[in-house]
Amino acid sequence: MTRHDATRVIRAATGTTLTAKSWLTEAPLRMLMNNLDPDVAERPQELVVYGGIGRAARDWESFDAIVAALTRLDEDHTLLVQSGKPVGVFRTHADAPRVLIANSNLVPRWANWDHFNELDQKGLAMYGQMTAGSWIYIGAQGIVQGTYETFVEMGRQHYDGNLAGKWLFTGGLGGMGGAQPLAAVMAGASCLAVECRRSSIDMRLRTGYLDTWTDSLDEALRLIEESCTARKPLSVGLLGNVADVLDELLLRGIRPDLLTDQTSAHDPVNGYLPQGWSVEEWDAKRVSAPKEVEAAARDSMANHIRAMLTFHALGVPTVDYGNNLRQMALEAGVDNAFDFPGFVPAYIRPLFCRGIGPFRWVALSGDPDDIAKTDAKVKELIPDDAHLHRWLDMAADKIAFQGLPARICWVGLGDRHRLGLAFNAMVRSGELKAPVVIGRDHLDSGSVASPNRETEAMADGSDAVSDWPLLNALLNTASGATWVSLHHGGGVGMGFSQHAGMVIVCDGSEAADKRLERVLWNDPATGVMRHADAGYAIATDCAKAKGLDLPGILR
């Protein structure tokens, strides 16, 4: 089992020449490779895409075997991938998924980091995060709009909709957290983001998600103060330990205007630098003494949350951004760790009730012009949504593509299938140079059960019911998605979530039209269904307006 190979440099093919037998298998092949592009993945030589140890394949041998299988699949074959390893090719039918993926799933009694790590070390499992092991990660852009929407809503609720002259404090500039600085600036606020790895800071600078950096807190605060005074948003990366910096801000009596965190706290061994440790010591002991790392990290997380709770008590709008930091602190003895809310119940759930979530698409041509044309098509088909148009304009201006050109765009039930059909028509007519794939984050309205994040504080108490993502995966499979994934532990770690993903190819065919209409209606409709079942009036109204047939819910 080879987990590290510094000689491997993977990039997706572009253009219209196929390596596989059809676009329906070429697409997952290119997206797997795109996940490991050096401009996309955090540690591609280790197959790590983002989120601590979120991998695209179990090991390099499995990666090569997946590639070989995808290149030989026929139009009625389905490849099965078990925790990053290809385990079977079966004859199904042309409208079945070409790939079915299950990552990190454990029987609940054994669904914890200790058991998973034991399996992982034996080469029997792989942590797929959400979009790492499901081959639809698009770099930091994948979360930037959701983060932007959250910050805009924080501004609306706490500062009358105006974040000019305000600043956000946060931690973590990895594959997910790296979206925060740009999202804050796009929302009108400055951002001070603490990151312990210089390489992560450098990647955000290189890809345009971060404006500048320093290793001096004094310099960072000076830059933030100047930007706020001038009301010109600026993002500053600070090399350091976020828990240490928060303690220092409290000592100095300095209060940010907004506070959150996106370190990889979900993984106490691989995701969080303990206070007082160097990165080099941490990296060495993650392998040689993982229990020591975990204990030290949990102590630091407790301190981190205590500082956030202090700011919260002082009136600073404080929110958990879904990394399970509060849970880790609770287990370390901070009994009131959940005194401040998670971002979904506080700011995002009304969108989920209407099936609105992180719709994304990728141009397999590799040509950015294909994304520009699809951006224009979105505006044409959704002409009256000024907020969406503003997002698309900002994205075109400020977001650098990582790997294959892509776009994230939060739209919901009734719009997703229209966009999919329009994109397919553009491929068919030759307006787009090659097919596009349409997917989403597993963080969506009907595809995840995560009591400390997406399903926190559900109205009916059904936070932990995980039937919903299972039904979502089954329905997307039946509807004809090109590949479907079912994962455990993404975002918040082992034992705390189950979630499903889907990707579908617009190859220009009439058969694709039928699949797109089914999948891109049914997928967001499960989110409306799930929230209607939980008693949300917004969701029941949406379900009635869209004519959903929900016999046990709408009576």
From Swiss-Prot:
GO molecular function, one term: urocanate hydratase activity
Entry-linked InterPro entries: Urocanase, Urocanase-like, Urocanase_C, Urocanase_central_sf, Urocanase_CS, Urocanase_N, Urocanase_Rossmann-like, Urocanase_sf
Family matches, as PROSITE patterns: UROCANASE
Subcellular location: Cytoplasm
Biological process terms in GO annotation: L-histidine catabolic process to glutamate and formamide; L-histidine catabolic process to glutamate and formate
Cofactor binding mode and count: Binds 1 NAD(+) per subunit.
Listed PANTHER family: UROCANATE HYDRATASE
UniProt protein name: Urocanate hydratase
Species of the source: Xanthomonas axonopodis pv. citri (strain 306)
Gene name of the encoded protein: hutU
